[in-house]
């Protein structure tokens, strides 16, 4: 799919139970990690010298980040599929863009880039697609305003947004009211061009790709536990000289989740997923599935580009319900829709606790995930910020039309559900899958999935 997706062109897809299990006679490769790909492009643009990136995700979200960094003066070149070069401008060296920065569907790109822009002496305007324009930005702009940047948004703190950055950014000491890797990262990126120490306190540990990559580029980043031991305090020394570095982007565990869960649920399946990122702050889904009874093993553990990776083999398994504690939510925040699909097929009840953050994703993912299941005959309840799924102990009824709300993860979850149900499941629009997992349908049908255009 091209970089410029038309918001008006939907792509309905039907998913049916396959005649046999999902299998491959070779390791399966899913796209590069989206979170790391965004950060590699942004931090590479702030470094001195040429950064080489291999395994970059070439989905629409990351391509928007690449275009934005070019617009800000960095040289960003694609040499081959997944192989990119970034000639950085140095901290404080980005230039004012001539046009609006369109971040498409990517909340990660929009929020992280807001941090970059906040500590540069320039003016920029940022927008996004219809979905992104509904998502709140104040959780980022409120703390960043304290560093001296100015922001003007639509009502409710939504895009489009005008940013007046500052070349004299003040270092921040900020306590996150809700654990969010995006907000933490935006503050750290702004802190790169602030004199002194920037400190972020988070109530629960969130993915630490920004901290790992900043260290890889030469920044001084220290992490210590909070007093209660549940969260972390991150300290960044401002105005380092970031040095260009080589980055190997691991396979995205959030993307690997979809073929992995499909193989767990379709009888007779067995696949191996190669080089999947195993950052312990991203593996909550894998831990939960093992608790549910998944036959999941990890081999060839190694470090690539500063991140732990490994090869995951998964076999069809009989699952049972579990309770997912709220402190695990940050390590699997993007995986709750697909976990809910596994819970729907499992026996017993699965309760996922503390999911408030799902309400401000590409859609209200909490409500949308519940609707995805209920329209296909699965009993599901929302109690406060908890999602409760009463498993069918086998194939759910299915037969529903799932409204995906331009949300790639809901669309993929619906299509995986359809591989398990008695009647086919239709996703009303699968076009937005390309934002994070280009080639999803090709990969899945290659394993034996039965997808067809509606």
Swiss-Prot record:
Localization in the cell: Cytoplasm
Binding annotation for phosphoenolpyruvate: 34, 107, 135, 182, 365, 409
Catalytic residues identified in the record: 334
EC id: 2.5.1.19
A cellular-component GO term for this protein: cytoplasm
Residues holding 3-phosphoshikimate: 34-35, 39, 180, 182, 334, 361
Catalytic activity: 3-phosphoshikimate + phosphoenolpyruvate = 5-O-(1-carboxyvinyl)-3-phosphoshikimate + phosphate
UniProt entry keywords in alphabetical sequence: Amino-acid biosynthesis, Aromatic amino acid biosynthesis, Cytoplasm, Transferase
Pathway: Metabolic intermediate biosynthesis; chorismate biosynthesis; chorismate from D-erythrose 4-phosphate and phosphoenolpyruvate: step 6/7
Functional summary from the UniProt entry: Catalyzes the transfer of the enolpyruvyl moiety of phosphoenolpyruvate (PEP) to the 5-hydroxyl of shikimate-3-phosphate (S3P) to produce enolpyruvyl shikimate-3-phosphate and inorganic phosphate.
Family: Belongs to the EPSP synthase family.
PROSITE patterns per the UniProt record, alphabetical: EPSP_SYNTHASE_1, EPSP_SYNTHASE_2
Subunit structure of this chain's protein: Monomer.
Region Disordered, annotated ranges: 1-31
One BP term from GO: aromatic amino acid family biosynthetic process
SUPFAM superfamilies from the UniProt entry: EPT/RTPC-like
Enzyme class: transferase
One Pfam short name: EPSP_synthase
PANTHER family linked: AROM/DEHYDROQUINATE SYNTHASE, PENTAFUNCTIONAL AROM POLYPEPTIDE
Protein name: 3-phosphoshikimate 1-carboxyvinyltransferase
A GO term, aspect molecular function: 3-phosphoshikimate 1-carboxyvinyltransferase activity
């Amino acid at each position: 799919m091209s970089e410029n997706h038309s918001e008006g062109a939907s792509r309905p897809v039907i998913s049916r139970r396959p005649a046999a299990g999902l299998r491959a006679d070779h390791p399966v490769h899913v796209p590069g990690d989206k979170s790391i790909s965004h950060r590699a492009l942004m931090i590479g643009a702030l470094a001195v010298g040429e950064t080489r990136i291999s395994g970059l995700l070439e989905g629409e979200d990351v391509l928007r980040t690449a275009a934005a960094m070019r617009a800000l003066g960095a040289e960003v070149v694609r040499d081959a599929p997944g192989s990119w070069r970034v000639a950085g401008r140095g901290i404080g060296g980005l230039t004012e863009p001539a046009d609006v920065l369109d971040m498409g569907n990517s909340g990660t790109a929009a929020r992280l880039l807001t941090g970059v822009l906040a500590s540069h002496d320039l003016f920029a305007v940022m927008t996004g697609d219809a979905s992104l324009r509904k998502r709140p930005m104040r959780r980022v702009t409120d703390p960043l305003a304290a560093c001296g940047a100015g922001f003007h948004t639509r009502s409710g703190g939504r895009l489009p947004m005008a940013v007046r950055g500052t070349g004299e950014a003040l270092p921040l000491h900020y306590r996150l009211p809700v654990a969010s890797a995006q907000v933490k990262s935006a503050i750290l990126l702004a802190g790169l061009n602030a004199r002194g120490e920037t400190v972020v306190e988070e109530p629960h540990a969130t993915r630490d790709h920004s901290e790992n990559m900043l260290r890889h580029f030469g920044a001084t980043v220290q992490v210590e536990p909070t007093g209660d031991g549940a969260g972390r305090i991150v300290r960044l020394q401002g105005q380092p000289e970031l040095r260009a570095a080589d980055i190997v982007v691991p396979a995205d565990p959030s993307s690997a989740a979809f073929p992995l869960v499909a193989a767990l649920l379709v009888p007779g399946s067995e696949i191996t997923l190669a080089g999947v990122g195993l950052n312990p702050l991203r593996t909550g889904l894998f831990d939960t599935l093992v608790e549910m009874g998944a036959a999941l093993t990890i081999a060839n553990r190694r470090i690539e580009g500063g991140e732990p990776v490994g090869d995951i083999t998964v076999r069809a398994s009989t699952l049972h319900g579990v309770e997912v504690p709220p402190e695990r939510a940050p390590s699997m925040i993007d995986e709750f829709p697909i976990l809910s699909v596994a819970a729907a097929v499992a026996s017993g009840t699965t309760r996922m606790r503390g999911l408030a953050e799902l309400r401000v994703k590409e859609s209200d993912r909490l409500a949308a995930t519940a609707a995805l299941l209920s329209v296909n005959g699965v009993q599901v309840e929302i109690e406060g910020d908890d999602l409760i799924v009463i498993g069918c102990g086998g194939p759910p009824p299915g037969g529903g039309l799932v409204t995906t709300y331009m949300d790639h993860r809901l669309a993929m979850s619906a299509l995986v559900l359809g591989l398990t149900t008695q009647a086919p499941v239709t996703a009303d629009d699968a076009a937005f899958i390309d934002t994070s997992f280009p080639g999803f349908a090709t990969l899945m049908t290659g394993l034996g999935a039965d997808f067809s255009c509606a």
